[in-house]
A protein has these predicted regions:
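N-terminal transmembrane signal-anchor/hairpin module of polytopic inner-membrane proteins
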Residues: 1-14
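Short charge-dense sequence patches
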Residues: 2-3, 52, 102, 143
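Alpha-helix capping and helix-coil boundary motifs
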Residues: 13-17, 63, 133-137
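Extended, charged alpha/beta regions that create polyanion-binding interfaces
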Residues: 20
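Functional transmembrane core segments of multi-pass inner-membrane proteins
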Residues: 25, 29-128
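Interfacial loop-to-transmembrane junctions
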Residues: 129-151
Length: 151
């Protein structure tokens, strides 16, 4: 996980580092809890959201365009996830809240990165779901948050 975070930070423009520190720091703790318990605690989510928001505020001073794309990514991701949660029940609401953070971080890198991140997270989640089912646990919930976060 640490190596993955270091690799992610290596690719991020320096002006966006405050946003990504919040995403990888508190967001990483959030998905670790999800991985272990299939539960995304609200309090930890709000801490991660506050850190990402503070990072976005710093980024906006230097690059206002990044703020627009990050907010668009956050709204689009959490909006789509809300629709899936509301009408299919296949997501927990914690995944909807996590979509806000993932969308902001991925959106800050542009439309192509946002699309790639969501596709990668979905593919990682699908792979994890297959492994989960092959282990005979298909009827049990599995944590989608970590795969989404890794995307």
């Amino acid at each position: 996980m640490v190596l993955g975070c270091a690799c992610a930070l290596w690719r991020v423009p320096a002006v966006q580092l405050p946003l990504w520190f919040g995403y990888l720091g508190a967001g990483g703790a959030l998905v670790w809890v999800d991985f272990k318990t299939t539960w995304l605690p609200k309090r930890l989510h709000w801490i991660a959201t506050a850190q990402v928001t503070a990072g976005l505020a710093v980024v906006a001073v230097h690059s206002p365009g990044v703020l627009v794309t990050a907010l668009a990514g956050a709204c689009a991701t959490s909006g789509v996830f809300w629709l899936v949660w509301r009408f299919s029940g296949s997501f927990g609401f914690g995944d909807v809240r996590l979509g806000l953070l993932v969308g902001a971080a991925a959106g800050s890198m542009g439309l192509q990165a946002w699309t790639t991140a969501l596709l990668a997270g979905t593919l990682i989640g699908a792979g994890w779901a297959i492994v989960h089912a092959l282990r005979g646990r298909a009827s049990e919930p599995f944590p989608y948050g970590p795969s989404l976060w890794l995307g």
